[in-house]
Amino acid sequence: MESFEGQGDSRQSPDNERGDNVQTTGEHDQDPGPGPPSSGASERLVPEESYSRDQQPWGQSRGDENRGWMQRIRRRRRRRAALSGHLLDTEDNVPPWLPPHDITPYTARNIRDAACRAVKQSHLQALSNLILDSGLDTQHILCFVMAARQRLQDIRRGPLVAEGGVGWRHWLLTSPSQSWPMGYRTATLRTLTPVPNRVGADSIMLTATFGCQNAARTLNTFSATVWTPPHAGPREQERYAREAEVRFLRGKWQRRYRRIYDLIELCGSLHHIWQNLLQTEENLLDFVRFMGVMSSCNNPAVNYWFHKTIGNFKPYYPWNAPPNENPYHARRGIKEHVIQNAFRKAQIQGLSMLATGGEPRGDATSETSSDEDTGRQGSDVELESSDDELPYIDPNMEPVQQRPVMFVSRVPAKKPRKLPWPTPKTHPVKRTNVKTSDRSDKAEAQSTPERPGPSEQSSVTVEPAHPTPVEMPMVILHQPPPVPKPVPVKPTPPPSRRRRGACVVYDDDVIEVIDVETTEDSSSVSQPNKPHRKHQDGFQRSGRRQKRAAPPTVSPSDTGPPAVGPPAAGPPAAGPPAAGPPAAGPPAAGPPAAGPRILAPLSAGPPAAGPHIVTPPSARPRIMAPPVVRMFMRERQLPQSTGRKPQCFWEMRAGREITQMQQEPSSHLQSATQPTTPRPSWAPSVCALSVMDAGKAQPIESSHLSSMSPTQPISHEEQPRYEDPDAPLDLSLHPDVAAQPAPQAPYQGYQEPPAPQAPYQGYQEPPPPQAPYQGYQEPPAHGLQSSSYPGYAGPWTPRSQHPCYRHPWAPWSQDPVHGHTQGPWDPRAPHLPPQWDGSAGHGQDQVSQFPHLQSETGPPRLQLSLVPLVSSSAPSWSSPQPRAPIRPIPTRFPPPPMPLQDSMAVGCDSSGTACPSMPFASDYSQGAFTPLDINATTPKRPRVEESSHGPARCSQATAEAQEILSDNSEISVFPKDAKQTDYDASTESELD
């Protein structure tokens, strides 16, 4: 493809460039045809001639090259001049050859909109589905749409039989995806562009895209050849951005200037446009103005476009005729000074003139008015009609189209989703105006139909669908008996409030009247005191959940004013004794104990305040709701202890059972008849938690398995955890936990680990170490001063707080070992035995796992986790200055006398051995830092990735250097690996 610089301009290009003189070579006569990518024209043009040239001696061939070079330059110039025609006489001037079809490079937007319009046609549905559903980019959309167009053309004109007898190509295709309505596959092929007589054919890449619809995935499908634009590199993207900016500016210009822009882009020859393509004098003056704007324009994008298009960086003005020739505008009757004035005015006005039109026209009509040219010359019809063949169709020139119907993102109006729980929408409830002693009764009485008021026990029982054999008192709302007798009732409807989650609470779960033996003043079942429940209940945090925590239970005294209202039940602990902890109003009434749950006194806090409730034997636990519902309901009827708020459901449940057992120790005989909830079979094993406060919690003594005392402050988060996530796995050895008593037995067969000793009073010799995991460090004695023994480097923090070791379950080894260790992220990290140095005995080089046990003689090794993160500074608080590198790096040189804390010092190779990385062993620091050992044995050279650092130094270069240096008499022994530095040519021994 001939770029705008002209491929022939570079001396490196082969002699016959692809666009230049292809007519003379007969290689293009047969079509490369289908199949594997054949070597295109560019490979077959050059070889014979270049081989013959290579046989000649160098000087002669170079002279030929120069001569051929100038010949080619002249031929190129001649060809360009012949195309543009401005060097020939004006009589036999022939317009340049143009392709026979309209040059209309569609923008990608036009094609995409066409694809969207193709949705309406049934036979193109699959293609548009593929384009629009799979989120493709514009390039793929272009490929698919052109594939469809090519396929339709093939079908319309039948099998195309070329000269070589090549018909349609077809492939067997399978879809890569199991879920698309239309699979596709592509294959690529390099061919030549179809130009007449194959003159100037470009070698291009064709991509055949095959589609198959609706799971018919193995079909013979005919290919459609699709031109895939090559992926643009950064320079091309820059160029595209410039061109796009120019097109955007062009869209703002007036139509006459847009037309001149299009003519220049189409022809590329200013002379040709000036002499052949401008009909009227006004058009000629417009062209002059356009040239004036271009000559003074400082917009880089427009400059780039203009010079690229005319192929020249010094624009020539076609009205400046050669001196022996009558200029064209004079023959058209335009005076020279008119042209000069128009040119200078446009130069002064600049780019803005193209949009506003400037004064010469006199009217500032908008660019869309099509009578701009025809209003002044009515005869100029062919100019207007030529607007259809403009080479670029800008979206601004066309009527605004609606967004394709595909992209309307509105969800289709279908039936609302069937929710798995009853909602006021799915199960409308009859509304009644029941007076409840609720603080929200006003809001509920005036509630809209979307949020209906409290539901009475109506006969419309749609849900719950599960069988509800209920034995529970019938609650008649208006004239209730003072003590209602338990009569079986029909299941009550779902609550009328709108439920916003899966937490279903039915009214019949809550409305339940209990036989009460008590004084008359509290014989009326009153409401849960919602204002005070707010302070107590750890669960109902938000007002909305609190409001729907327990639907209003109907008290027998609802016809009159409530017997004990919210004011009567005082603050949580300071009410009358009959008003107990206000979890449920006066404890005599208790909160309505929800059916399958405990009918035990729910209001019975740790002090047994108020009379004791005896549940009638007739009130057996109902099988009311599925277990999930029970789980969520139990949340709402937990006892309100005066201690710390329980923070998770299992704590609350366990606390309720504890208080139950504490309060009535004699009720164990009665508990067979008492309907305490059987522990559901679906209860997870989370309730077997060890309840150990991280502070000063005592292990809890309780007879129940899952019990947690709500009176003890338990500082755990709300979700149950199996251990303190900050602690390492071995709780008995962790220094933070060692001072605490043994935790509560977490499961039943649990043997208690041996209790650790009290913290060290002085330094004791530790027993022979049995490390629980590799590299575990025992905490040093607390009695010692911080530098009392060598290598001690300050108190240990819990390792989970160290920023490098956030993962306590798979820790690093604590000591820097040689070789590759799995990081803490690897779940399969093997727990290796402690690895030592290469030194033979347990001498001074042994990397000690216990820093306080180190021999005084050995150089103290810094523990890795004690080194601060800025590794370039040695830790200032370690008593002896370390005389070794931070991590022992196996290099081919002996360890230097001073620590090499160079930022480039350590690199880990993916092969597993820690070896000096490229910069360390390279020319930057080789001479500067490393003391060379000339007589050292030379190990194998470290692998160097060629990709990351550019091409690695090739071994032959090293070999050459070695030969050169071994010939040198100065250096008799030279290590194989050592390279000369780039910055001075001195050898390593001189640097030493």
From Swiss-Prot:
<feature type="compositionally biased region" description="Acidic residues">
    <location>
        <begin position="506"/>
        <end position="520"/>
    </location>
</feature>
<feature type="repeat" description="6-1">
    <location>
        <begin position="576"/>
        <end position="580"/>
    </location>
</feature>
<keyword id="KW-1078">G1/S host cell cycle checkpoint dysregulation by virus</keyword>
<feature type="compositionally biased region" description="Polar residues">
    <location>
        <begin position="659"/>
        <end position="676"/>
    </location>
</feature>
<feature type="compositionally biased region" description="Acidic residues">
    <location>
        <begin position="381"/>
        <end position="391"/>
    </location>
</feature>
<feature type="compositionally biased region" description="Low complexity">
    <location>
        <begin position="595"/>
        <end position="611"/>
    </location>
</feature>
<feature type="repeat" description="12-1">
    <location>
        <begin position="606"/>
        <end position="610"/>
    </location>
</feature>
<comment type="subunit">
    <text>Interacts with host CTPB1; this interaction leads to gene repression, but also seems to interfere with the repressive function of CtBP pre-bound to DNA, leading to EBNA6 mediated up-regulation of many host genes. Interacts with host MYC; this interaction enhances MYC stability. Interacts (via N-terminus) with host RBPJ. Interacts (via N-terminus) with host histone H2AX; this interaction facilitates H2AX proteasomal degradation. Interacts with host TP73; this interaction inhibits TP73-mediated apoptotic pathway.</text>
</comment>
<keyword id="KW-0804">Transcription</keyword>
<feature type="compositionally biased region" description="Low complexity">
    <location>
        <begin position="738"/>
        <end position="764"/>
    </location>
</feature>
<comment type="similarity">
    <text>Belongs to the herpesviridae EBNA-6 family.</text>
</comment>
<dbReference type="GO" id="GO:0044204">
    <property type="term" value="C:host cell nuclear matrix"/>
</dbReference>
<keyword id="KW-1121">Modulation of host cell cycle by virus</keyword>
<dbReference type="GO" id="GO:0052150">
    <property type="term" value="P:symbiont-mediated perturbation of host apoptosis"/>
</dbReference>
<feature type="compositionally biased region" description="Polar residues">
    <location>
        <begin position="445"/>
        <end position="461"/>
    </location>
</feature>
<feature type="region of interest" description="3 X 13 AA tandem repeats of P-[AP]-P-Q-A-P-Y-Q-G-Y-Q-E-P">
    <location>
        <begin position="741"/>
        <end position="779"/>
    </location>
</feature>
<feature type="compositionally biased region" description="Polar residues">
    <location>
        <begin position="700"/>
        <end position="714"/>
    </location>
</feature>
<feature type="compositionally biased region" description="Pro residues">
    <location>
        <begin position="563"/>
        <end position="594"/>
    </location>
</feature>
<feature type="repeat" description="3-1; approximate">
    <location>
        <begin position="561"/>
        <end position="565"/>
    </location>
</feature>
<feature type="repeat" description="5-1">
    <location>
        <begin position="571"/>
        <end position="575"/>
    </location>
</feature>
<feature type="compositionally biased region" description="Polar residues">
    <location>
        <begin position="845"/>
        <end position="857"/>
    </location>
</feature>
<feature type="repeat" description="4-1">
    <location>
        <begin position="566"/>
        <end position="570"/>
    </location>
</feature>
<keyword id="KW-1276">Viral latency initiation and maintenance</keyword>
<feature type="repeat" description="2-2">
    <location>
        <begin position="754"/>
        <end position="766"/>
    </location>
</feature>
<feature type="repeat" description="9-1">
    <location>
        <begin position="591"/>
        <end position="595"/>
    </location>
</feature>
<dbReference type="GO" id="GO:0039645">
    <property type="term" value="P:symbiont-mediated perturbation of host cell cycle G1/S transition checkpoint"/>
</dbReference>
<dbReference type="GO" id="GO:0019042">
    <property type="term" value="P:viral latency"/>
</dbReference>
<feature type="compositionally biased region" description="Basic and acidic residues">
    <location>
        <begin position="715"/>
        <end position="724"/>
    </location>
</feature>
<feature type="compositionally biased region" description="Low complexity">
    <location>
        <begin position="859"/>
        <end position="881"/>
    </location>
</feature>
<comment type="function">
    <text>Plays an essential role for the activation and immortalization of human B-cells. Represses transcription of viral promoters TP1 and Cp through interaction with host RBPJ, and inhibits EBNA2-mediated activation of these promoters. Targets host chromatin through interactions with host transcription factors, especially RBPJ and IRF4. Alternatively, EBNA6 also regulates the transcription of the EBV oncogene LMP1 in a cell cycle-dependent manner.</text>
</comment>
<keyword id="KW-0677">Repeat</keyword>
<keyword id="KW-0945">Host-virus interaction</keyword>
<feature type="repeat" description="10-1; approximate">
    <location>
        <begin position="596"/>
        <end position="600"/>
    </location>
</feature>
<feature type="region of interest" description="12 X 5 AA approximate tandem repeats of P-P-A-A-G">
    <location>
        <begin position="551"/>
        <end position="610"/>
    </location>
</feature>
<feature type="repeat" description="1-1; approximate">
    <location>
        <begin position="551"/>
        <end position="555"/>
    </location>
</feature>
<feature type="region of interest" description="Disordered">
    <location>
        <begin position="355"/>
        <end position="905"/>
    </location>
</feature>
<feature type="repeat" description="11-1; approximate">
    <location>
        <begin position="601"/>
        <end position="605"/>
    </location>
</feature>
<feature type="compositionally biased region" description="Basic and acidic residues">
    <location>
        <begin position="12"/>
        <end position="31"/>
    </location>
</feature>
<keyword id="KW-0805">Transcription regulation</keyword>
<feature type="region of interest" description="Disordered">
    <location>
        <begin position="931"/>
        <end position="954"/>
    </location>
</feature>
<feature type="repeat" description="2-1; approximate">
    <location>
        <begin position="556"/>
        <end position="560"/>
    </location>
</feature>
<protein>
    <recommendedName>
        <fullName>Epstein-Barr nuclear antigen 6</fullName>
    </recommendedName>
</protein>
